Amino acid sequence: MNLPTTNQKSAEYKVPSTESNKPQPRPQANVTKPTNASPIVNSIRRDTSWSVPATRPAPSGAAPMQWNLSIDFSNKNKPGTGRDAIDRTSIQRHQYNNRRPQKRDAGITSEAFLRHRDEVKQVRVQDFTKLIKKDEVPLRIIPLGGMEQVGINCTILEYKNDIIIIDAGIEFATPEMHGVDYMIPDINYLTKKKKNIRGILITHGHLDHIWALKHILPELDFPMIYVSPLSLGLIRKSMDEKDNKQLKYKIVDPDMDILKLGVFTVEIFRVNHNIPESMWFAIHSPKGLIVTAWDYKIDHTPAIDKPADIWKMSRIGQEWVRLFMGESTNAAKPGHSISEKIIGQNLDSIIRDCKKRIIVSTFASNIGRVMQLIDSAVKYNRVVFLAWRSMINNVKLCQELGYIKVPPQMIRPIGPDVEQMPDERIMIICTGSQGEEFSALVRMSTNTYKDFSLSPTDVVLLSSHTIPGNEKPVIDMINDLIHLKVEIIDDNDLDVHSSGHGKQEDIKMMMAMFKPEYYAPIYGDTFMRHANKKIAISMWISDENIMMPEENGQIIELYDNVVITSDKKIKLDIVMIDGKGQWHMSGEYVMKARGIMAEDGVVALIFKVDTKTKELVWNIQIESRGFVYSWEVKSIHTQIVEFARAKYNGNQKKWMDIKDNLRQIKEELGEFVAKIIGRVPMLMPMFVYINKDPKGIAGDITQDEAILGMTLEEQGYND
């Protein structure tokens, strides 16, 4: 471009008229729509109006002002559109903003806030109790789970006579917990205050957040739960018909709903996780704004869900966030979590290029991943066979809710017909990615799965990461698959799995967006939460403003001038679900007894006693299980019986109480067995009486009845 000289500019310059000074309308661009545009592009173009709401800083003492910036790309001449049209999203957000709680202190300035924070910090270091007003009632946050483990997510917020609960999940039992299915939160504290419960907020539908509801809701008289449609469906499937009829619920819309629960006002916003309809809560309370950031990842291109509501997050971040509670699962891992869209593209390319039968193993609860797999399978004309009940139930629920929209004949439970179709038309989606005993893939790897057998031409795709602690069963399963000569694809070959939890850079992004005064690393093992704490310190949150409860039950207290991790704790027990039974760990000897039997076996001895003479009237009978190898049984059994007979005959004139005699025989027998085999099994000496009712000798025991009802404590298992 040639710039004019000074003289040229002077000669050409004319003073513009007043009329020409008026703002001119921006010319409209005429965009010709390509005739060959893809359906994806067309669907994007249908949404022709963008709206960017924001909150302006308000003058001191004034309420915050709202404005909407709308950019219209639609055809001006089209009826009902153009510059005079009002964007529906703008209306919704305007209505939403009008219903929101106002800022806690709309007139506070940045300088005043910083000065207040520095004053509080100076006093707090010396003696934080000076910051607490006399007779001030704090808002109490009580974690019933999630502070010592990944699981049992359940947190209470309590202020005076109002309580809200966030989630109620489980933790699966460890191998050492013989016979236990899973553990649930101890709600003894809540049962005493169930009239104060204003509602239960559900973040998403994973088992570690909802599966305990079927146990605790009846005990709490079925308080209202606030839940998304998918989470509600998963909750209903976990409950029996009777409890389903009593279930009280409200389906919430994160884009529009604001809940009033006692003194708490709750805003809801969308986040991304590996299950659709995940939510966070911004809780306005008498002690400030609390943001609860349970399971999440920052995914700008999610596969099947809407992106996280960054607009609402940033707007809330402009307010004074008193406390931010953020999950810690991936806090020790650097970087960002990979987008589910990338995982979906990689899976799609594998399915497209593979001409063999494909078996994919993933979590049944990873509904987003399962939906991507089904879409790709149908795209390449593969029939999807589902293996295992949890996988079948979850897919059926997603079909009912409209998340999965494929021809019904393309999805079916696995059966004999799977062997009758061409390999290139088959995909099997199954459980077992963690090597769980009796899971579908584990049974397939050992050729014990009904109606289906793996062959050397199959491809097994492991779309998951190994959870810490599951390494051994996963390796065993992979070894079995290798023996079957199948091809294995896992995350080491290609990105076929992404965690549903944010990593370090995701956590930093949330801290920068919300700018909390106090921070509480939650949900994870101790090392995870400490890694989260280090991130908070790197983001300029001072150490004394980071709340780190050491264990479940330790209380976080919010006062007007300070937030503290209190020394106060509520006593919590480990509540275990064992089949249809529910029992507490403390005071129970079941787990110890199961451990002894699992490690060392069990030996039972039956003494038949004449109650008049106290003499043995028959040979001592002995039975054992898991005790010694078959070639040793006869020899060791004989030694034990002879020792037991000698001890009984030597003591029979002395004992007055049968329980004392049982304890003495058990103790001496244990020492003897330890000498001959080097370990002590569970020993169960039992007496059977003949000739006389022994009432008065051993209590109310009927004739010819063995003492089988003695507790483990009475048998000496109380050490």
Predicted regions, residues:
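Short, low-complexity, polybasic intrinsically disordered segments
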Residues: G696-L712
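A short acidic, often aromatic-flanked loop/helix-cap motif at beta-alpha or helix-coil junctions
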Residues: Q149, D255-K260, N274, I392, ...
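Hard-cation-handling environments
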Residues: A332-S463, I467-N492, V496-K515, A520-W655, ...
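Intrinsically disordered, low-complexity RNA-associated tracts
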Residues: M1-K121
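C-terminal tails and terminal domains of large nucleic-acid-associated
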Residues: W655-N691
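His/Asp/Glu-rich metal-coordinating catalytic cores
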Residues: K103-L201, H206-Q420, S439-S453, K472-V474
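C-terminal accessory/connector segments of nucleic-acid motor ATPases
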Residues: S361, R679, I697-A698
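Short, internal active-site loops enriched in acidic
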Residues: A331, N366, Y689-K695
